[in-house]
Structures are given as structure tokens and as C-alpha cells.
């Protein structure tokens, strides 16, 4: 290993695609990005967290039990992160678990009588991704690049960073998903300036970004999207069709049956995926419910054309953001040389047709839409550590940022699609004589009036010296960092009085709450580790007892009675220990049995030695000698099994 390779091993930064439906983790290895498979052997992990009593399940185990535990299984939590309860009323209607609001009006989950925030759910998924990387790399991971939808606002980005902190990760950079995909696509492209569009339709959000790439520079020209549009909405369209059809045929409304709804939601997702490759699919859900006449079964045929009619409006909703992104970039469709398809929904033929109609060309299918974002995040991690050189990423802010001014008007300071990091300053004044303070209300959005945009923060600049209206010179500065997170300051130029804030997420997570959640996550990680160790000890003890009993039954005629009785007692001790929750007792009983089992091995070795001595009498010597001679002259015979055994044993000798 060279010095440079050794250095790249230190401070490795993983790339995480924290998706609505699935998440993925990748890392730079040997100068190339590598997607890491989970413990279950899959390259993506369902973004699902479930609670069963004191147990927390993440990923595939959580998804598997969702049908029987829908109220305590959180899916699509990304649609709620950094958002107020009033902003997610439409999403709440589509999930089986309880979404409520806390004291700040934030959307939170109520699980088993406790309040759990979307940030905590996201943190559990990030911990799973972190552990997946650690298991593969064999080293502790503390740093990550995490992707977010390009159209995520400031609150949602900050909440994602908070989730990373709760998971024990230092989030070195938040980057938009389309930008990450462009990095993955363009890293090995040697072509000079090339303009591309990244069409990213995932499980919960839609993004479109237009970029110019060339000579290692990835410059985002514009971005647009819809954070309320994704695969979940397509699933719900199929689900509603199934519910209506079943109600018409059977006269039974399944909407209040949460277990049936979860089964149908899973069936809808499966049918949607299948119809990307076939023209029709069967949906069969036996014993979905029952009435006085007996059990009812749901059997339906869904064709691709029917799916397209059910989801036509959803697919068409991708058109306007694409046209807006093109317009904002100053390009037309003929200037775009490639349209990169990202996100699972981009596999749908009807979606690909819309892409073709908008851009006048087929979408590029040379990247894996489920993995490309994580790959791009890993590349960005490589850029930050110096593993990837000569790459410059120039991103933009997706929404206009400004403040409220006289008359309830929003005055922009940073226009949308401004390259970041950036700083903008503007001078304002007071609206009344002798005004002692001003309230700076920070807004994000494209509307003209302040109340029509999203308020992402507010603060006061006090102790302004008395003076006529319009006289004080108040400088407001907006500073956006590379993560797209905003820092705001206001300064009275006459007195030098200044007030600064970093715009915190409107998730209501204060510093103390984040620290508490970090501690909670660490404690749960320790609990999970102990629980895993307990399961392993139990399995080992149970397996040993079984093997010991089998060996005892097999060799009971050759084992002295005293040893046989001792082993029987030890087996019984293990079985009794397994009936308890005392792990120390189980471990002790297992160790005792292991020691006792060695005696069987010793007895059998002696018996084998005596048997071999007896078998080498005058009558058998010639045969043995012949075999030995035969071995020497036929080294390479494939059926010479005895010789193979001897060679293996010899190889193991020091």
C-alpha cells in the first residue's frame, strides 16, 4: 500500500442517498465509487422504521412486518421532515400511522403513546446506512455527505443535517440529488462543455436540474421541482382505484381497515413496478376482509394503459417544472445534449414518453436510477477528502430568499438559481419616526406578498437611536453556505449595533432536543448491540446443546459412563439457562458444555488411534504399502480422496 492509499483510508466520507422509499450508501474505494450492500444483501434499504414494544426495526425487517403493525411502522417520513402540520394535510390522509402537531406546529408522529420527530426516524435510517458502511469497510465512520431533493427549502435541509447529527454523523455537505446524479454521470466524461438535464422522479419528490459540465466543473444553471410529487402518489392512485372497485363489486369500504390498507398499498407498489416491464398484472389479495356471508378475496387485473390513465395528471405535473428550469437556464430543449433519468419512477414508460416530448430526445438510461445519487454523494465525499481531484461543484439556491418590507411585500435579496455559496447585502430603513427596533422576517418563495411565502425565521434588531423615519441605515446581509443553508445579519450602520442568526429549521428542534436525541440514539445503539449479542449467545448455546446431544447419542457405547453423565448434565444446564433471560448464566453453561465436549473428542481420538493400530497387522500391511506406492505414482488422480485429505492437513502445518 502506498502512502497516498494509506492517507485515503483516514477520514473516509461516505455518501448517503436518504430517500423517501429507499436509501443507499456508497464510498470511494480504490479511486472509484462503490455502492455498499446491506447485511440483508440488498444494495438499497427500505426507508422504513418500525416500533414493536421496546424493539426498533429498520429497513427490510421493518417493511416485512408492516402489514401486521401498520400504525407503528413509519414509511415515507421524508415527506414530513422540516414541515409544519398544516403543510402536510394531504399526505396525512395517505398514511396508516398517526401524524400530529407539537407545540411549534411541526408535523410529528405519535407512536405507542410517544412523540417521535421525522428527524429521529431519518436518523435511524442514517444509522443503518452508517453501520452498513462500517461493516463493509471495517472502520468507524463519522462523516458523510447526504443528499436532499433540489427543491427542499431551508428548513428541510437544516432538518436533514439535524438527523445526521442525531445519527452520530458530521454532515460535511448537503447536496441536491440531481447534482449528485450529474456528478456520477459526468465524472468520467472527457467531453468539453456539455449541457445536461437531470430528471429525478423518486418516491416522494420530483426535481429537475439543468447543468453545464466540462473540464471537471459541474455548474448548476437552474433547478425546479415539486416536493409533493413522487412514487407514493402513484401508489395511492392505484390504491384508490382498488378501493373504489372493491367497494362497487362487494359493497364493502376497506378504507378504515388499516391492515387491509397496508396489504393493498404493498400490492399497489408491486403492480406499479411490474407494469414497467409487462402490459398487465394480476393483483390477488385473498381473505382481504369478511362479512356475514364469509371471507372476501380481492382479485383484479391492472393493465399498463389503465395505470397510465390513473396517473396521467401526476405525470403531467412534471412538465411545468421542466419548462421552468429550461427557461431559467436560458436554454432551449435543443441545447440539452442528454437527459439523465433518476429515481425509480423514471422507469415507467409513460414518464419516459413525457421526458421525450419535453426535451425532444430519449432519456439516458446508462445509470442505475436507484444508486446513482448515492454514488454522486460518495464522489462529493471524495472531493472533500482530496481523493477525487479537479472537480468543482457550483450549485444554486432553488428558491428566492428575501425579507418582509413595508406593506407586507416580500423584497428579494437572493433570487432563485443564484450560484452558492453567496452573500447579498441591501440597505433598509425604518417605517416610523423614532422607531426603536425592527423585526427582520426572513422569507423563502416566489410570491410577491410576504404572507404567501414560507417564513423560515425572524429576529429583532433593537436599540436603534431615535431618528425620523427613513433616516437609519440598516444593512441586511444574506449569507448562503455550500449546503444551501442561510445565515442572516442586520446592522445599524450609524450605531454599529448588529444582530446575526443562522436560520434554524422550522422543525422546532432546539439544541437541547438534538443533544437528547443523540444520547437516545446512542443508548438505543448500545441496546441493539446487546440484544444482538444476546441472540447470538442464545443461538450458539442452543446449537451446541443440539450437537452435544447428537454426539452423545452417536458415541454413547464408546464414551465412559462418567463422561456421558457429565455431558448430559451440562446439556440440561444449558437448556434450563435458555429458559431464563440471564445471559451470564447462558454463557457460563455454554462454556462448561464446550469444555466437557472436549473430553468426547479426546476419547474418540484415542479410540481411532487404537483402531488404526489394530488394522495394521501382517495381512493389511501389504495393502497399505501398495496404496502408498499407488499414491506416489498417481498423484493427480481425481478420485484419490485419502491423498487429498493428507495434503490439506499438511498445508495447515506451521
Curated annotation (Swiss-Prot):
Q: Which CDD domains match?
A: ASKHA_NBD_HSP70_DnaK-like
Q: Where is the composition biased (Polar residues)?
A: 608-621
Q: Outline the segment boundaries, as ranges, of region: Disordered.
A: 592-654
Asked whether the UniProt record includes Protein biosynthesis among its keywords, one would answer: no
Pfam short name (any one) = HSP70
Q: Which Gene3D superfamilies match?
A: 1.20.1270.10, 3.30.420.40, Actin, Chain A, domain 4, Substrate Binding Domain Of DNAk, Chain A, domain 1
Induction text: By stress conditions e.g. heat shock.
HAMAP family found in the cross-reference section? DnaK
Name under which the protein is recorded: Chaperone protein DnaK
Species for this entry? Protochlamydia amoebophila (strain UWE25)
Gene encoding this polypeptide? dnaK
Amino acid at each position: 500500500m502506498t502512502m497516498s492509499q494509506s492517507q485515503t483510508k483516514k477520514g473516509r466520507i461516505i455518501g448517503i442517498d436518504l430517500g423517501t422509499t429507499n436509501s443507499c450508501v456508497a464510498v470511494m474505494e480504490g479511486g472509484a465509487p462503490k455502492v455498499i450492500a446491506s447485511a440483508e444483501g440488498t444494495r438499497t434499504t427500505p426507508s422504513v422504521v418500525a416500533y414493536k414494544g421496546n424493539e426498533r426495526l429498520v429497513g427490510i425487517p421493518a417493511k416485512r412486518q408492516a402489514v401486521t403493525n401498520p400504525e407503528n411502522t413509519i414509511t415515507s417520513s421524508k415527506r414530513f421532515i422540516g414541515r409544519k402540520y398544516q403543510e402536510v394535510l394531504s399526505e396525512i390522509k395517505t398514511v396508516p400511522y398517526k401524524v400530529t402537531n407539537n407545540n411549534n406546529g411541526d408535523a410529528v408522529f405519535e407512536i405507542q403513546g410517544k412523540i417521535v420527530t421525522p428527524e429521529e426516524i431519518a436518523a435511524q435510517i442514517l444509522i443503518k446506512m452508517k453501520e452498513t458502511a462500517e461493516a463493509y469497510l471495517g472502520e468507524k465512520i463519522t462523516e458523510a455527505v447526504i443528499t436532499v431533493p433540489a427543491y427542499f427549502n431551508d428548513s428541510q435541509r437544516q432538518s436533514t443535517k439535524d438527523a445526521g447529527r442525531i445519527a452520530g454523523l458530521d454532515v460535511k455537505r448537503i447536496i441536491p440529488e440531481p447534482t449528485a446524479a450529474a456528478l456520477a454521470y459526468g465524472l468520467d466524461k472527457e467531453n468539453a462543455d456539455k449541457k445536461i438535464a437531470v430528471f429525478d422522479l423518486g418516491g416522494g419528490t420530483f426535481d429537475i436540474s439543468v447543468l453545464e459540465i466540462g473540464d471537471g466543473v459541474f455548474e448548476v444553471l437552474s433547478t425546479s421541482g415539486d416536493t409533493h410529487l413522487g412514487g407514493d402518489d402513484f401508489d395511492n392512485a392505484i390504491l384508490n382505484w382498488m378501493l373504489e372497485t372493491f367497494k362497487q363489486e362487494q359493497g364493502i369500504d376497506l378504507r378504515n381497515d388499516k391492515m387491509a390498507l397496508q396489504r393493498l398499498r404493498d400490492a399497489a407498489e408491486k403492480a406499479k413496478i411490474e407494469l414497467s416491464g409487462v402490459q398487465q398484472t394480476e393483483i390477488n389479495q385473498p381473505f382481504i376482509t369478511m362479512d356475514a356471508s364469509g371471507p372476501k378475496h380481492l382479485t383484479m387485473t391492472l393493465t399498463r394503459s389503465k395505470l397510465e390513465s390513473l396517473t396521467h395528471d401526476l405525470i403531467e405535473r412534471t412538465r411545468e417544472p421542466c419548462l421552468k428550469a429550461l427557461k431559467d437556464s436560458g436554454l432551449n430543449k435543443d441545447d440539452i445534449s442528454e437527459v439523465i433519468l433518476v429515481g425509480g419512477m423514471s422507469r415507467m414508460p409513460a414518464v419516459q414518453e413525457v421526458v421525450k416530448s419535453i426535451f425532444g430526445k430519449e432519456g439516458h438510461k446508462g445509470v442505475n436510477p436507484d444508486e446513482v445519487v448515492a454514488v454522486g454523494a460518495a464522489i462529493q465525499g471524495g472531493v472533500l477528502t482530496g481523493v477525487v481531484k479537479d472537480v468543482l461543484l457550483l450549485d444554486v439556491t432553488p428558491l428566492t430568499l428575501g425579507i418582509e418590507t413595508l406593506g407586507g411585500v416580500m423584497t428579494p435579496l437572493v433570487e432563485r438559481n443564484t450560484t452558492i455559496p453567496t452573500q447579498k447585502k441591501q440597505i433598509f430603513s425604518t417605517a416610523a419616526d423614532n422607531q426603536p427596533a425592527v423585526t427582520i422576517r426572513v422569507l423563502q418563495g416566489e410570491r410577491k406578498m410576504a404572507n404567501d411565502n414560507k417564513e423560515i425565521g425572524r429576529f429583532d434588531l433593537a436599540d436603534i437611536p431615535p431618528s425620523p423615519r427613513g433616516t437609519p441605515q440598516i444593512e441586511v446581509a444574506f449569507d448562503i453556505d455550500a449546503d444551501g443553508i442561510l445565515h442572516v445579519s442586520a446592522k445599524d450602520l450609524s450605531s454599529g449595533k448588529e444582530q446575526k442568526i443562522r436560520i434554524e429549521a422550522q422543525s422546532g428542534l432546539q439544541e437541547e432536543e438534538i443533544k437528547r436525541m443523540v444520547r437516545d440514539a446512542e443508548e438505543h445503539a448500545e441496546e441493539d448491540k446487546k440484544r444482538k449479542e444476546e441472540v447470538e449467545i442464545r443461538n450458539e448455546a442452543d446449537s451446541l446443546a443440539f450437537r452435544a446431544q447428537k454426539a452423545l447419542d452417536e458415541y454413547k457405547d464408546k464414551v465412559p459412563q462418567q463422561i456421558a453423565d457429565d455431558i448430559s448434565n451440562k446439556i440440561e444446564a444449558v437448556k434450563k439457562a435458555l429458559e431464563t433471560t440471564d445471559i451470564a448464566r447462558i454463557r457460563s453453561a455454554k462454556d462448561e458444555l464446550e469444555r466437557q465436549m472436549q473430553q468426547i473428542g479426546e476419547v474418540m481420538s484415542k479410540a481411532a488411534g487404537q483402531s488404526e493400530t489394530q488394522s495394521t497387522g501382517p495381512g493389511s500391511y501389504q495393502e497399505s504399502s501398495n496404496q502408498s506406492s499407488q499414491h506416489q505414482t498417481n498423484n493427480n488422480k481425481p478420485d484419490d480422496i485419502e491423498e487429498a485429505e493428507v495434503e490439506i492437513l499438511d498445508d495447515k502445518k506451521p
